[in-house]
Amino acid sequence: MADSLAAADGADVTADDLAPGAGTAALGPVVLNAAQRAERTSRAGPVARRLAGTGVTIVALCWVDNTGVTRAKTIPLGRLERAAGWGVGMSPVFDVFLINDDITISKYIGGPGGDLRLLPDLERITPLAGQPGWAWAPVDRYTQEGQVYAGCQRSFTRRMTEQAAEHGLELRMSFEVEWAVGTEDGGSFRPACVGPAYSMTRVVELSDYSREVVEALERQGVTVEQFHPEYAAGQLEISVAAADPVAAADDNALARHTIRAVSARHGFQASFAPSVVAGTVGNGGHLHLSVWRDGQNLFAGGPGRYGLTGDGEAFAGGVLAELPALTAVGAPSAASYLRLVPSHWAGAFQCWGRENREAALRLVTGSAGEQDIRANLEVKCFDLSANPYLVAGSVIAAGLAGIRSGAKLPAEIDGDPAALTADELAGRGIRRLPQGLPEAADCLDRSQVLRRAMGDPLFEAFLAVRRAEAELFGGASADDIAAQTRWRW
């Protein structure tokens, strides 16, 4: 029995039961009126009593900022009813925090003025198995006047999900979670295990820790589909069940927090940084997604290549076309570009391929006889320095733009693009994705698709943070970038 008071029940886009319909996040009102505030306050009472029955005494109200860091304000459980109806105050300036907690400014956000309200999602409040006595609650951010805040990343994802529904589409998403577990030793990373990559030796070395990570996630309603040791030193990975886009982003934020909490209880630290040690394989945050209409997976059962339907191909084509700009969203840190290098299965080239782990966009078709439930897209160039809500919403926006324009996929690539000559790459229309944060920010700045989707306040704040971090790390070495950001995510 999950401890989550309203766990998102989903299916795994990389495994079984991909059909949509479960785990759909409730859509919030655009403007809160007095009756809605009273209704929220009333609903919070039973939730608080149920939380108290599990031993919870304090609630962390959490949001993910434009650097990918989860920020929080906490309240005693007795304040939940008030917070549910009227929120908890915060400054808009958090939207222009940098990864080192410096503050920049954007066209719309910055400075000491203004206030927002954090309203917990009562359907997702979850007792934390790895942090007894605490509960986690993702928040939606509203203005003092009760309007949805234009810079709220979670609301952006919800808005894009609604736009997809207007096209008759349901989306299922899941983020892979890779992390390195270890400790800091004289400024260097010391892995918690020494066994070979993917080996049972690592499982034995971290047996109790690994079991507790999986058990904690399951108790919190996050269904773990797979857990395994990964390639880099001290690196592990989990794959979780799919859900609708908002719930998938919630699950990603909760999974990372849970792993961090369990790690601390074992005397370890968990790093989700794209580059834990410069020059080695980094942590990815690949996104899997499937798109459905009337119960049909648009990536299977159609007349196109590998069973793609027309709208399935158009959605994928839209994502592929926007990948340079999407890279700034899904690989948004200076450390991202220490990971995003060719021939490392990171997806460093703007291309697609069936089951090609070097392509930035991988079509996963599944085995014969079950493609209709398993087929999905994997975006491989993303990592966990990203805000999962911005990633989910931006990918939907790109895919919908592809459907509107009738986008077509180019010829696929079935090997490592890095093995091709410059002339061969040019002849096939394959380009390297941005190789640094300044280039990625420029690509984002030129994207009318993402600007229109996010709206200027959110878009400009996010872009300002990217520009400021590009300047912050402009003269830093790879070793310095990795060391300075290792424990920030």
List PLM regions with ranges.
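Short glycine/proline-enriched loop/turn "hinge" motifs that connect secondary-structure elements
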Residues: T126-G133, E170-R172, F227-A232, T280, ...
